[in-house]
């Protein structure tokens, strides 16, 4: 059993150490130009459709969560009377 574990460890280590690294293009300067551009558009919408959807989903969850928390606090503050 120990031999199997050691073999698995060696295979895993070899796989990790011999994989080629992917070189990604640095897009930071491009994004900086996009977001620093003065075009009158709010910064949370400059990223495109995905940013707009993410913003709306975040606002929906925030408002919904706040409303639910207030509702639960009200229900806890005014419990139903027992007969």
From Swiss-Prot:
Q: Name one GO cellular component term.
A: mitochondrial inner membrane
Record-annotated membrane-spanning stretches = 49-77
- Which membrane topology describes this protein? Single-pass membrane protein
Alphabetical list of SUPFAM superfamilies matching this protein: Mitochondrial cytochrome c oxidase subunit VIIa
Family annotation (Gene3D superfamilies): Cytochrome c oxidase, subunit VIIa (4.10.91.10)
Q: Which source organism?
A: Rattus norvegicus
Belongs to which family? Belongs to the cytochrome c oxidase VIIa family.
Query: What does the function comment of this entry state?
Result: Component of the cytochrome c oxidase, the last enzyme in the mitochondrial electron transport chain which drives oxidative phosphorylation. The respiratory chain contains 3 multisubunit complexes succinate dehydrogenase (complex II, CII), ubiquinol-cytochrome c oxidoreductase (cytochrome b-c1 complex, complex III, CIII) and cytochrome c oxidase (complex IV, CIV), that cooperate to transfer electrons derived from NADH and succinate to molecular oxygen, creating an electrochemical gradient over the inner membrane that drives transmembrane transport and the ATP synthase.
Database matches in InterPro entries: COX7a, Cyt_c_oxidase_su7a_sf, Cytc_oxidase_su7a_met
**Name this polypeptide is given:** Cytochrome c oxidase subunit 7A2, mitochondrial
Location of the protein in the cell: Mitochondrion inner membrane
Under the heading CDD domains, the entry gives: Cyt_c_Oxidase_VIIa
Note whether Cytoplasm occurs among the keywords. no
Q: Where is the transit peptide?
A: 1-23
Assembly, in brief, is: Component of the cytochrome c oxidase (complex IV, CIV), a multisubunit enzyme composed of 14 subunits. The complex is composed of a catalytic core of 3 subunits MT-CO1, MT-CO2 and MT-CO3, encoded in the mitochondrial DNA, and 11 supernumerary subunits COX4I, COX5A, COX5B, COX6A, COX6B, COX6C, COX7A, COX7B, COX7C, COX8 and NDUFA4, which are encoded in the nuclear genome.
**Residues recorded as bearing N6-acetyllysine in the entry:** 33
Q: Name one GO molecular function term.
A: oxidoreductase activity
The residues on the Mitochondrial intermembrane side of the membrane are 78-83
One GO biological process term is:
mitochondrial respirasome assembly
Q: Does the keyword RNA-binding apply?
A: no
**Segments on the Mitochondrial matrix side according to the record's topology features:** 24-48
The UniProt keywords, alphabetically, are:
Acetylation, Membrane, Mitochondrion, Mitochondrion inner membrane, Oxidoreductase, Transit peptide, Transmembrane, Transmembrane helix
């Amino acid at each position: 059993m120990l031999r199997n574990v050691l073999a698995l460890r060696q295979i895993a280590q070899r796989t990790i150490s011999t994989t080629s690294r992917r070189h990604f293009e640095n897009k930071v300067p491009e994004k900086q130009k996009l977001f620093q551009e003065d075009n009158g558009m709010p910064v949370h919408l400059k990223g495109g459709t995905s940013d707009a959807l993410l913003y709306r989903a975040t606002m929906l969850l925030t408002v919904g969560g706040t409303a639910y928390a207030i509702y639960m606090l009200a229900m806890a503050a005014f419990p139903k009377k027992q007969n």
